[in-house]
Amino acid sequence: MDFEQISRSLLPLLGGKENIASAAHCATRLRLVLVDDALADQQAIGKIDGVKGCFRNAGQMQIIFGTGVVNKVYAAFIQAAGISESSKSEAADLAAKKLNPFQRIARLLSNIFVPIIPAIVASGLLMGLLGMVKTYGWVDPSNALYIMLDMCSSAAFIILPILIGFTAAREFGGNPYLGATLGGILTHPALTNAWGVAAGFHTMNFFGIEVAMIGYQGTVFPVLLAVWFMSMVEKRLRRVIPDALDLILTPFLTVIISGFIALLLIGPAGRALGDGISFILSTLISHAGWLAGLLFGGLYSVIVITGIHHSFHAIEAGLLGNPSIGVNFLLPIWAMANVAQGGACFAVWFKTKDAKIKAITLPSAFSAMLGITEAAIFGINLRFVKPFIAALVGGAAGGAWVVSMHVYMTAVGLTAIPGMAIVQASSLLNYIIGMAIAFAVAFALSLTLKYKTDAE
């Protein structure tokens, strides 16, 4: 493959060198921020040798080349375009300026939660293991092994406000360590553990205001709002405090002001917001049942196109941290939608006689089955439209099944086949059946519907 030739072919189709604001790449895609998106010819770009798909998302023109190829194309492209290397964060900053307010909020929440997903996934896997140990009586609950497993599985959720405080402060422009400190205040041992409230809690009289001494372990919205407020306070203090006193006074005043406001006002308000969202969703799922799964499973892939799905991490973490819920009933639905995209894409592989399309569909379908759907959605299914519609129907069918069968997950971040690792042991069989339904429905519809499957 001639990477220099690919780069030379790309430039005029992107509006020329002067239209390239920045270039970066991820594992599979060349990510470009263009001065004027209208100058790019997506259809022509898709016909270039080596290009597996092309789409606009999150303010970027993203061209799919695949693992092991994209880095070589990128190296040749920045030389041909005469631009300097950009990090993914720099490209994302430029792209963010093109996003609408909803997409910016979604991107912000994604940047806050993605770094802490490994901790939540680890805890979720350990919770699943602990559940199996408890269900099958492998180890007595008083045994040291059981106690240590319990400690390891719950740790990330107990200190979740501290983890969120750190990453949120970084995104809001505050000091991450002050953000973590504020998260620590909200989970201080002086406050009754949020999961032990049923046994009773005490209140504190603060100048005539009765403050409930309840901790915020496992919560999301209280610390998000509190750290946003803290970052605003910190930035304003830095403007007025002399440099000589900045190191001492700014952290001191920031923590005491934001800490008091968080405990008295923001924390209770954030808890009410989180509980309200959880209540609405759980009520909808419990009362609408499979109809809710049908709706959510069918619409999820449409939401993915907008990029707003990144904001769901916050809601899912809130469900897991809520003592009255403690499970993620949304992620199994999203997983069905992702599997359906893989099924619809796989059907295109059987239908098409175009060698180039055939070369793209198989890896794209496999990627979707692992929970990464961009290549399948933008590279194949949306390109031919009807496979995307088939995937929506498959996602709806799978979503209806997992909701009706009460399939729950114990973490966030993993969907499709990898999601099996964080599914509750009692739900695993129905999760697999749901994937089979989503895949089969999407595959069958995509295979039987009539549409052109060539690169033209």
From Swiss-Prot:
Residues 4-87 form the PTS EIIB type-1 domain. It is an enzyme of class 2 (transferase). The chain crosses the membrane at residues 112-132, 144-164, 181-201, 209-229, 247-267, 288-308, 329-349, 360-380, 388-408, 428-448. Pfam families: PTS_EIIB, PTS_EIIC. It is found in: Cell inner membrane. The active site is at residue 26. GO terms for biological process: phosphoenolpyruvate-dependent sugar phosphotransferase system; trehalose transport. The phosphoenolpyruvate-dependent sugar phosphotransferase system (sugar PTS), a major carbohydrate active transport system, catalyzes the phosphorylation of incoming sugar substrates concomitantly with their translocation across the cell membrane. This system is involved in sucrose transport. The PTS EIIB type-1 domain is phosphorylated by phospho-EIIA on a cysteinyl residue. Then, it transfers the phosphoryl group to the sugar substrate concomitantly with the sugar uptake processed by the PTS EIIC type-1 domain. This is PTS system sucrose-specific EIIBC component. It comes from Klebsiella pneumoniae.
